[in-house]
Design a protein with these regions (language model features):
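Short acidic, Gly/Ser-rich segments with clustered Asp/Glu that frequently serve as metal-coordination loops
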Residues: 50-55
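Short, solvent-exposed loop/turn and secondary-structure capping segments
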Residues: 56-58, 186-187
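Compact, glycine/acidic-enriched structural inserts
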Residues: 61-120
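Charged (Asp/Glu and Lys/Arg) segments that form or flank catalytic channels of large polymer-
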Residues: 1-30, 35, 39, 43-46, ...
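Short glycine-rich loop/turn motifs
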Residues: 41-43, 59-64
């Protein structure tokens, strides 16, 4: 619990004070938040992604942990499951079974007691041995988990939640608002980043988000995690920044700086010095693409 709590009760209280300051629907309506003191609530999150492995194979990796944990990834991310993507059954059957167990596990942590039933809703019996003996007992003394985040790249979020609106759609592409990929109304296009963009006025409430997912023929078990909320479903910062806009923003900035031969500061001076090399690399890339 020392690792999951961020090292101290004060770290937990500080995190929850920040969360309370947002005054959002998730905080106000989460049953675990309303029934447990902040120094006993561990904010939990989980992350998923298809990780590249040997010889081009991919592995679906899901891990979980505390949002307030401090330390390196090896110590703070706890593996939940890993399965080769090629071994997944067609459709959603394999993932459904995995996410049923994840949902069941997180809900047990949020209740703070060893579960009395398995992920299928069947009660444990004497044949289940240790699980039956521990059923209903405190799981972590007086601590409870509190789901606070689902994180991943867009592909995994789409597949894990069965999002009908995604990057593969020609119309609506976002699970949080009604923004579109192509539209005669420029204001509703996803490329409109203005603060007054019309699509910002279409942000879904959590109930609207849940209604969309529940209306589908197949529903992801993850939306039945206690306290599940659209505002706590987020894109992994690695994919948004490092593998996303930085790949465009950084080269663009370097191009502008070297083109104008900016010299202010030692850093810019170094950029000017590598300008010939950058031009050569750009020429090589164009030749390869041709």
């Amino acid at each position: 619990m020392h690792l999951l709590s961020g090292g101290s009760e004060s770290a937990l209280i500080e995190w929850w004070n920040d969360a309370k300051g947002l005054s959002d629907d998730w905080y106000e309506n989460h049953p675990v938040i309303q029934t447990n003191p902040p120094e006993r609530r561990i904010p939990l999150g989980f992350h998923g992604d298809d990780a590249g492995t040997y010889n081009g194979e991919k592995t679906l990796a899901v891990n979980w942990g505390s949002i307030v944990s401090v330390g390196c990834t090896l110590d703070t991310r706890l593996p939940f499951t890993m399965v080769k993507v090629k071994d997944l059954l067609p459709g959603f059957e394999t993932e459904k079974s995995i996410y049923e167990v994840l949902t069941w596990s997180l809900n047990a942590l949020q209740e703070g007691k060893f579960p009395t039933h398995n992920e299928r809703g069947l009660p444990f019996t004497e044949k289940d041995g240790w699980r039956w003996k521990m059923a209903g007992k405190l799981l972590a003394n007086s601590y409870v988990g509190c789901w606070a985040e689902m994180r991943g790249d867009w592909k995994w979020l789409k597949e894990a939640l069965l999002l009908p609106d995604n990057y593969g759609s020609n119309a609506k592409i976002c699970f949080k608002c009604a923004v579109v990929k192509f539209s005669a109304n420029v204001g509703m296009r996803y490329t409109n980043f203005r603060r007054d963009a019309p699509h910002r006025g279409t942000i879904y409430s959590n109930q609207e988000f849940m209604d969309i997912l529940l209306a589908a023929c197949v529903v992801s078990p993850l939306i039945f995690i206690t306290g599940f909320h659209v505002t706590r479903v987020v894109f992994d910062i690695l994919h948004v920044l490092d593998l996303g806009i930085y790949q465009v923003a950084v080269p663009s900035a370097m191009k502008e700086l070297t083109a104008t031969k900016a010299t202010a500061g030692a850093g810019l001076g170094k950029l000017v010095g590598v300008r010939p090399t950058l031009k050569e690399l750009a020429g090589t890339r164009r030749a390869v693409e041709a």
